[in-house]
C-alpha cells in the first residue's frame, strides 16, 4: 500500500498526511500520528478500551522483533473488515485520533531553556 492508497482509504475521515519513517509510513491528522503502515498492514493508536474493541474485531497488536525482543507500541491492526471500507476505516481512525489527542494532552510540556548570560 502506498501513500495515495492510504489517503484514499481514509478519505471519509478527512485529510491525512503520510510521512515515511523507519521503513514504514506514519499516518497523521491535525499534526498527530494516529496510525502507521508497516509490514504490509495499517495499525491504529489504541488505549485499553479501544484495543479491546479492536481485538473483538479480529485485530492484533502491532509488534516487531528487535534485538531478540518483541516490541509493542500501543497500536493495533486495522480490522480486515475496514481495509476495503473507507467508512469503517474512518470510524476507527476517529477513535485513534481521539486517543492520540488525549496522549498528547497528557504529556508534560517541555520547559523552554532560558538563555544564560
Where are the model-predicted features located?
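Charge-dense, helix-prone N-terminal extensions
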Residues: 1-117
Amino acid at each position: 500500500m502506498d501513500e495515495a492508497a492510504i489517503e484514499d482509504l481514509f478519505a471519509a475521515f478527512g485529510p491525512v498526511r503520510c510521512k515515511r519513517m523507519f521503513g514504514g509510513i506514519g499516518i497523521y491528522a491535525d499534526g498527530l500520528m494516529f496510525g502507521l503502515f508497516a509490514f504490509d498492514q495499517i495499525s491504529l493508536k489504541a488505549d485499553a478500551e479501544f484495543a479491546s474493541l479492536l481485538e473483538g474485531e479480529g485485530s492484533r497488536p502491532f509488534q516487531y522483533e528487535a534485538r531478540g525482543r518483541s516490541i509493542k507500541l500501543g497500536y493495533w491492526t486495522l480490522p480486515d473488515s475496514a481495509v476495503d471500507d473507507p467508512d469503517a476505516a474512518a470510524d476507527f481512525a476517529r477513535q485513534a485520533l481521539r486517543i492520540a489527542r488525549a496522549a498528547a494532552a497528557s504529556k508534560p510540556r517541555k520547559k523552554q531553556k532560558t538563555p544564560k548570560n
